């Protein structure tokens, strides 16, 4: 059993009003490079990518954005957006999600929505359903047949005001959420904005294209099942976390 030591917050369930703060990425580097059409993939600094089964806020995740030449580039960023104008980097803990309904107007997100979209690489996520006054049951949600998808994301960069210009900047991302579809609604009142492969270019395109993609993913193209409560501990990082359990 492999456990990952993390400085992420100990989140035992999920954030109120947001999607639950956990997702998975089982893609190997070769699969990711082929799927996202990454150029020169085998000399990339994150080509040693390993499968992850319990991404949590404030941890590093892989996103794909457009580089200076308009080519897709994968980048490791911290989950939890820190706007470039923020006084410190603590804001990220409360900004793992951005509501699709207000993302174009909110000061923390509107600049990123206009100019810094990204695809958050994932192949599944966890949500917690209330089953009693104090008890929640985790579920794993994914696309049927493991059809490729990405979360709609935004990214930004931050550097302390007193830091020298040559100090590396902190790059962070957030995941957009929207109203739940029929599959997700009994489990949670929000769901991530999920982009099928045909929508990736649009999300990385114009603002109008992004606005047209702020919708719930079709329930009939998804599936879910209950999983064990070990996923509630961010240090647990083993493959059996996504296995179905009886309830």
Language-model-detected regions and their locations in the chain:
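Short linear sequence motif anchored by a di-proline
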Residues: 2-247
């Amino acid at each position: 059993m492999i456990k990952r030591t993390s400085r992420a917050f100990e989140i035992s369930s999920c954030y109120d009003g947001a999607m639950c703060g956990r997702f998975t990425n089982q893609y190997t580097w070769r699969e990711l490079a082929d799927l996202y059409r990454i150029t020169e993939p085998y000399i990339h600094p994150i080509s040693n990518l390993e499968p992850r089964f319990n991404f949590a806020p404030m941890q590093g995740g892989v996103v794909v954005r457009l580089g200076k030449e308009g080519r897709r580039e994968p980048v490791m960023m911290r989950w939890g957006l820190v706007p470039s104008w923020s006084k410190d980097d603590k804001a990220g803990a409360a900004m793992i999600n951005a509501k699709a309904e207000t993302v174009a107007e909110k000061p923390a997100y509107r600049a990123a929505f206009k100019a810094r979209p990204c695809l958050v690489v994932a192949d599944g996520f966890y949500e917690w359903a209330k089953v009693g006054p104090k008890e929640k049951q985790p579920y794993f949600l994914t696309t049927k047949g493991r059809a490729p998808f990405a979360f709609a994301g935004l990214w930004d960069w931050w550097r302390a005001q007193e830091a020298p210009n040559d100090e590396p900047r902190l790059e962070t991302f957030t995941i957009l959420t929207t109203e739940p579809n029929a599959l997700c609604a009994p489990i949670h009142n929000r769901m991530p904005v999920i982009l099928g492969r045909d929508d990736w270019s649009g999300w990385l395109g114009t603002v109008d294209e992004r606005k047209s993609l702020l919708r719930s993913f079709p329930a009939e193209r998804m599936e879910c099942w209950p999983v064990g409560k070990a996923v509630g501990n961010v240090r647990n990082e083993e493959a059996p976390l996504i296995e179905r359990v009886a309830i």
